């Protein structure tokens, strides 16, 4: 039994974890945010890094110090039924319903679509989806090979290709960040808007989901002691989030500079294609196609493996390959509704789920303060759940928001919760729930004595 990982293992596992995290949204959202934030990009980028880098790292630390095998075990500290519901919902969101279809559509719209005529778009998206998820299924059949597939091969290739475009773009900028117009949403609350934009990467959710893969990989390298696994998980995570922070910052500033040459695009995928074509023409588009397909494929492999391993844990009557087949077929179908529509549909669900995930992560980190009392977990989560429902409803399309029951909830929330209009209404209730939970916990201890 090994006492710790070798130096090269940290590098490979950190590379694998980065590769698992860095997929579709990680490329397109910071660029689009940069275009809209303009000269306010420094504040917006800082907010983005908090949710897109800070919370995923806290999620890795939470899994490490709690010595949990994954999100289900962590969520049982609230309640076992809640753990089932939360885990299933989380994996459906980052699996077949939103994240996985988004990976295929992003790959297609950035890497393939620019080379096709309009009439070929729909049939070839269907064909591409089959090929994409067929390849991801093939690579996911043996979870023990993930370190080789992603950490040693796909991710280094991705970094080299992306680095090439970033070096060219920053050495010959499209425009000045300081001359870029600040969008309406970013004029008064750039940090907060950047913060909620970071939700779209799904990485705080993914940190909880990928925990099972990281821990399994470290065990495969010969480390068996739970406390040592916890430390090694955090060390490997530090390499991953460091890389993410650097690349996010480069992409967001690239987006802000690009408005010196291009109009703000419908989504970051279009902007990235325009930038690559401007600098390198057809060759640039080919490189970009490779970057995006590799980025999305490696994340798809990780998500499909994590989904299948977790569902075996939740429902052990079926084997790994059964769940792998399900998580290959469903997103292949959903991918055909298009990237912009997938993003639009996912926002209300993310606004509901993210506060619950962040709260769970923070409770796991603060657990020693209140002796990991179930009562504190339950009261804090209950308070957060109320606000998370309102945040999710607030992100619905306007026709649904105008329905009387929903409108009544939203009007009450706007009047009662600070930062609600910015998608942050859950913070006050989460803090209040935590304080009440701790008071009840410590009063019970004193009474019992």
UniProtKB/Swiss-Prot annotation:
The protein, known as: Branched-chain amino acid permease BrnQ
Keyword Cell membrane appears in the UniProt entry: yes
Transmembrane segments: 11-31, 46-66, 81-101, 120-140, 157-177, 198-218, 237-257, 283-303, 323-343, 350-370, 375-395, 419-439
Annotated source species: Lactococcus lactis subsp. cremoris (strain MG1363)
Molecular-function GO terms, alphabetical: L-isoleucine transmembrane transporter activity; L-leucine transmembrane transporter activity; L-valine transmembrane transporter activity
Location(s) in or outside the cell: Cell membrane
Glycosyltransferase as UniProt keyword: no
UniProt xrefs under InterPro entries: Brnchd-chn_aa_trnsp_Livcs (IPR004685)
Main location: membrane
Lineage: Bacteria, Bacillati, Bacillota, Bacilli, Lactobacillales
Domain of life, source organism: Bacteria
Similarity remark: Belongs to the branched chain amino acid transporter family.
Gene name per UniProt: brnQ
Membrane topology: Multi-pass membrane protein
Keywords carried by this UniProt record: Amino-acid transport, Cell membrane, Membrane, Transmembrane, Transmembrane helix, Transport
Coiled coil (UniProt feature): none
Pfam families (alphabetical): Branch_AA_trans (PF05525)
GO cellular component, one term: plasma membrane
Known role: Branched chain amino acid transport system which is involved in the uptake of leucine, valine and isoleucine.
GO biological process terms on file: isoleucine transport; L-leucine transport
């Amino acid at each position: 039994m090994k006492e710790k990982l070798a130096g090269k293992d940290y590098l490979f596992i950190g590379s694998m974890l980065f590769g698992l995290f860095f997929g579709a949204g990680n490329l397109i959202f910071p660029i689009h945010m940069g275009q809209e934030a303009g000269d306010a990009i420094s504040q917006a980028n800082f907010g983005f890094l908090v949710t897109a880098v800070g919370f995923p790292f806290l999620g890795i630390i939470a899994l490490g110090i709690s010595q949990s095998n994954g999100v289900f075990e962590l969520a049982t500290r609230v309640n076992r039924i809640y753990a089932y519901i939360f885990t299933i919902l989380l994996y459906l969101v980052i699996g077949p319903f939103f994240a996985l279809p988004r990976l295929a559509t992003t790959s297609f719209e950035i890497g393939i679509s620019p080379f096709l005529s309009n009439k070929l778009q729909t049939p070839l998206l269907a064909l591409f989806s089959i090929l994409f998820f067929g390849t991801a299924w093939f690579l996911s059949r043996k979870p023990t090979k993930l370190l080789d597939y992603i950490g040693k091969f796909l991710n280094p290739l991705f970094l080299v290709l992306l680095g090439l475009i970033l070096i060219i773009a920053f050495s010959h900028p499209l425009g000045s960040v300081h001359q870029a117009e600040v969008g309406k949403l970013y004029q008064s609350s750039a940090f907060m808007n950047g913060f909620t934009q970071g939700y779209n990467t799904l990485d705080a959710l993914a940190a909880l989901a990928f925990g099972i893969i990281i821990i399994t990989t470290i065990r495969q390298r010969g480390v068996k002691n739970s406390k040592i696994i916890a430390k090694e998980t955090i060390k490997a995570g530090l390499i991953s989030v460091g890389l993410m922070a650097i690349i996010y910052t480069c992409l967001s500033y690239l987006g802000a500079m690009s408005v010196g040459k291009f109009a703000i695009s419908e989504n970051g995928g279009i902007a990235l294609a325009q930038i690559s074509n401007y600098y390198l023409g057809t060759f640039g588009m080919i490189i970009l196609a490779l970057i995006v397909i590799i980025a999305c494929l490696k994340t798809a492999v990780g998500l499909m493996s994590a989904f299948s391993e977790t569902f075996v844990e939740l429902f052990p009557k079926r084997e790994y390959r059964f769940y792998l087949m399900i998580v290959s077929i469903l997103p292949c179908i959903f991918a055909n509704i298009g990237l912009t529509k997938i993003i639009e549909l996912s926002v209300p669900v993310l606004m509901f789920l993210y506060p619950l995930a962040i709260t769970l992560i923070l409770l796991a980190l603060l657990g020693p303060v209140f002796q990991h009392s179930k009562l504190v977990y339950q009261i804090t989560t209950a308070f957060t759940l109320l606000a998370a429902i309102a945040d999710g409803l607030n992100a619905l399309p306007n026709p649904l928001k105008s329905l009387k029951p929903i409108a009544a909830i939203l009007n009450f929330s706007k009047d009662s919760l600070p930062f609600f209009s910015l998608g942050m209404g859950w913070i006050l209730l989460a803090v209040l729930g935590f304080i009440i939970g701790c008071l009840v916990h410590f009063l019970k201890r004193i009474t019992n004595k």
